[in-house]
Every structure is written in C-alpha cells, then in structure tokens.
Amino acid sequence: MILAIDVGNSNIVIGCCEDGKIAFSERISTSRENTALEYAISFKTILELYNIKQNEIDGAIISSVVPSVTTTIKLAIKKIAGIDAKIVGPGTKTGLNIIIDNPAQLGSDLVVDAVAGISEYKLPLIIFDMGTATTASVIDSKGSYLGGMIIPGVNVSLNALTAGTSQLPKINLEPPKKVISSNTVDCMKSGIIFGQASLIDGVIDRFEEELGQKCTVIATGGLSGSIIPYCKRK
C-alpha cells in the first residue's frame, strides 16, 4: 500500500492507494509551525480511522508546494511507517515530456496532475487545479505538457475583495439564488461563484482555440466542487 501526501498552501491531503485503487482520502490544514511529531500523530490517527496498520505501508510519496513543510512531512512519515518517502521534484522520472521554458520550474502538483490525467483520460487535456491558486494545465495529443495559466484562487479573490473595501462583508462561499442578485451579500456570492465559473469557461475556449482542437477538461482541488457545477462547459 502506498501512502500519498499532497501538501498545498492551505491544506494537506493524505490518502492510500493499493492495486490502482484509492483506499481513502482525507484533508487537514497546512501548518508551517507543526513539528514532525504533530504531523505524525495526525497521520497515524487518520490511518487508524481506516483500520490501516503502519506495517501495511510499503511506500510513500510526497508532492509539495510548501518547501518549508516538505522535510517535516517526510520525517513524520518516517516516524509512523519507518520508510523514506519519495519527494516529487526535478529529476523525478515520471515519463512526462515537459515543453516549457524551464521544466525544473514546473510545480510538483502540476506534474502529478498531468501524469494522473494522462493515465486516466483521453488526450488532449486541460486540467484545472483549484486551491489557494487556480492553475490551468494543457497537455497535447502526444502527452506533452505545453504550459498553462496561474489564476488567483477563489478564496484569494474573495479575501482580496473584502480586505480591499470598507463596506463589503465577509461571506460564505455558497451560490445565490440568481445570477442577477439584489443585495450586497448575494452580489458578492454571484461575482465570486459565477464569475469564477465564467472565467473557467473562457479559459477553456481560449486554450482550445489556440490548440485548434477540443480537449478533455478535468477539474480537481479543494474548491473545484464549489465552482465547477456552475460552468457551462462540462
């Protein structure tokens, strides 16, 4: 069984895979202050919830966009499973052909998104990963990573809206009843949710126009479920 850890700016996703199937997936908050022991306790508790014994873990892999936390997570895995986790990064052999100006700059999260997408879906691909930032990746019909786009994330946009204005309140991320809203809170919800959904629709159109062909579109990340249902493109 493989223990997989995805370290994002806001959340850490932990899961186990066996024989190509996902045994479970859970999410905890990313804390740059936590020690290896604190993370080890969290991971051990999650494994116990799913009745997975530490000696059942044969290997571990980490994808991280938070360098200051990466080593701490690796030490935490060593504590609970007694194994050295592999870290996805420059030099990791994934088989992905990366055609960008500096392949070493491509984040590990985008690498694993692309590798998984190529494995599971019909090419060419557009992959949206919606977390603290929203990233859009394009993989061509040959399975090569061409590049993409980085967009302010849903919560980043919402927080900027409330922080930069004096009279706009903090709101929950839930859809209003109508796109054309009639009060401040619903107008903000409409702008964030339908605005982000329209942004994604527009990016897809522009990517496909530049590629000259239709693509399979995939969305992942903690905030995708809040936005993707309101996209016109399926």
Describe each PLM feature range.
Residues 1-3, 7-92:
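N-terminal glycine/serine-rich phosphate-binding loop of ATP-dependent small-molecule kinases
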Residues 1-25, 117, 123-145, 161:
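Gly/Thr-rich phosphate-binding beta-strand-loop-beta motif of the actin/hexokinase/Hsp70
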Residues 2-4, 157-234:
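ATP-binding/phosphotransfer module of carbohydrate and carboxylate kinases, centering on a glycine-rich
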Residues 31-38, 106-108, 113-122, 127, ...:
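Glycine-rich phosphate-binding loop plus the immediately following alpha-helix
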Residues 35, 69, 135, 157, ...:
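Short phosphate-engaging motifs
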Residues 39, 43-47, 113-117, 121, ...:
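Generic hydrophobic alpha-helical segments
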Residues 50-106, 142-149, 153-154, 182-193, ...:
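Short beta-strand-loop/turn "lid" adjacent to the catalytic site in phosphate-handling enzymes
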Residues 50-55, 120-122, 210-213:
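Glycine-rich phosphate-binding loop signature in dinucleotide/nucleotide-binding domains
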